[in-house]
């Protein structure tokens, strides 16, 4: 039996929510979701469709929005006889009718808790039509659904069923979507990401496209750029292009011979298998496989991008805060770990300011924007036992920090991770050192037990009264970010 999957992506989700909360039409309102209290370099979490129409990408930085609107307004003004605007508007319908109006837009600060609530409500709407075991939540605004078992029940085609679900979401929330249907998960994703987004929307802004293996090869084997395809980043695309493969059809053709397949494995290792499958439009993984998957190794990690470059002293404060937060996260989930990792990313200013640049003699790399930066510092440290003790974790991560940090450089990014994470109840008893003092071991175990009780009490208070209900002195030191981040979800305002 042929299977049918749907991928549904809520249209400019955060921006749509902000429009709806203001009683505005998401398809007609120029709005950007960005924290303007930060610098203009802050990334926009969402841009409304009407604002995107002026050439602004969905993940632009705020200054890019400002500059593009300014450029577009200059062009509009130059076309006016008197070279002066009569007013301004945030509505595309008004701007289309009246060329004398300047383009304006709303900048809405992120409200992550609100977006999470909308996402949960929309998930409940989907559950009216399909069971949870046939749905995989890919992100806050995107889901995959196995439609196969429901087509006969509803006496509908895959397209009709998806249309009904999206119409229900629109009716109840005001948010529209883009959707793709495919005979496997990959084709559903590509139908949505590539095919649907180049189609004309209906009167509600809804786009829908379908693909099977044959139509995928006919429609998309010649498509460029390669980065439009799921899981093909700039690095992979560059490597393919350097070897004469500028389209997925080229990859499929190369894989037909043993020599070509061997070359792909030499270039990409085990990832070549997935690349070849996707070039042909194959994807064996199902939603049932995703639900059944259990990783061999578990880890927890947290990272943050600092608002400004930090020196070593202030960075150490943040690392200590992050170590404590990681320990509390483990405690709350009844987990323990026995290894920590730390990555310190340095700021671009280190190679721009003459004094810093001349002092640096280390390895240089490039960031996502092609700018030269010092190579990051990375290290790991093993703990003597599985633990969630904030004392042991902070001691270990600060020792690791002191070992790997380049004190002459300014820091911009910090990532901390806990590896070999297991459930606390699955811990093996610690190996007893025959030469250790029995009394010392007993004292340490009692100390760890007390620490665990304190950490649990802190979590209970934070859960009841808010994350800033219990704070330590470190949270008030210069450079500390913990208090502010406690009011955020995913690094953005809750």
Where are these regions (language model features)?
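Contiguous hydrophobic segments
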Residues: 70-83, 299, 312-323, 327, ...
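Gly/Gly-Pro- and Ser/Thr-rich, intrinsically disordered tail segments characteristic of DNA damage-repair
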Residues: 1-287, 439-494
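Residues at or immediately flanking beta-strands
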Residues: 176-178, 341, 413-415
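DNA-contacting surface of Y-family translesion DNA polymerases
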Residues: 7, 228, 238-411, 426, ...
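Acidic, metal-coordinating catalytic segment for phosphate/diphosphate chemistry
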Residues: 17, 370-494
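Short, charged/polar surface micro-motifs in flexible loops or helix N-caps
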Residues: 11-13, 37-41, 346-351, 421-424
